[in-house]
Amino acid sequence: MGSSFRAAKAAVVEGWRRVAGFPLGLLALWVATAGATLPAAAMLAASIEDHLGDSMTASAVASGVDLRWWDEFSSAARPGRSFSPTIIGGAAPVGTYAGLLDGDEPPVDILGAVMLVQLLWLFLSGGLLDRYARRRRGGARGFFGACGVFFFRFLRLGLLAGVAYAVIVGPYHGWLFETAYPWLTRETSVERTAFLWRALLYTLWLIPLLLVNVIVDYAKVRAVIEDRHSMIGALVGAVRFVRRHPAPVAVVYGLNAAVAAVVLAAYIVLAPDGRGGDWRLLAVLAIGGLYLLARQAIRLAFLAGAMTLLERSFAHADYTAPPLPVWPDSPAAEAIDNAALVATLRSSE
């Protein structure tokens, strides 16, 4: 057990080192993710401006939170249905996690932005993982070539994972909390007992959800370092690896989850409240941007740590990464090379 913990700890440290060694990739992911949300933010800003106009309510809203206006705007404006008081400060991530646990559907008006962010993640993560596997510079051509190569593979993997997530978030969640929970607490009058049953059901729901998440991430890593074309094969390989190395896999995941919990706690404490003021607006943008950057760094560090753990579990640590993508020559240049090769062969006869 001690050796497994040391190996997992070393993998986590190496994962963070690889992410820190390519800061430009992390910055590109952050810029792409933030940029993908700008259209939705612009639509919301225009809707707020149209709704307020030059009314006296505008000054009240600018100076702080006006819940009466907020309720009116959320019910009247379609782009504002996701614009609720739960987005203020640290309540935003807490509300997101609470909604996930309770099986709430995401607001329809932000689905487009969410899908765009996920597609950008699928595209850029292939190039980032390829860079972490090689541990050397490949240039812009190599990076975006790897992004293009692995995008469609990760897209197929995402569709397979989506089926599993849909079952866990949909029917399985409904059975636990709409069927099992009422039956288990039908004769319970003590609130603490009902809470313990609900906590147990949350655990039973989170275990398969996290397990699928871990397997899919290890499948991504195996697809990159082994240049796998079949995502079913990558999933099977990931399942085998997780089954054979449960302790180090759990430690790598747990250590990065602990870092994520610390970052979340810091954001909850530092995030400004809903009071107005230019400096508070700047603080919201700065702290929110840093929180997003930290979350993406943690996600990449977990993948890089999983990659390190896989490499060290194979025959040798420096596992062969896929070859650098090479752009083909033009047809004219290829014809010249072929003619030269034919002339060389004829002269040697």
Language-model features: locations:
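Individual transmembrane alpha-helix segments
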Residues: 85-120
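Hydrophobic transmembrane alpha-helix segments characteristic of membrane transport
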Residues: 119-149
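Cytosolic-side membrane-entry/anchor segment at the start of a transmembrane helix
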Residues: 5, 14-24, 142-171
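Non-cytosolic segments of integral membrane proteins
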Residues: 163, 167-188
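Short membrane-interface loop/juxtamembrane segments of multi-pass integral membrane proteins
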Residues: 146-150, 190-191, 237-245
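Loop-to-transmembrane boundary segments
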Residues: 151-160, 242-255
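Hydrophobic alpha-helical transmembrane segments of multi-pass integral membrane proteins
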Residues: 27, 108-124, 128, 159-172
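Juxtamembrane transition segments at transmembrane-helix termini in multipass membrane proteins
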Residues: 2-90, 124, 181, 192-231, ...
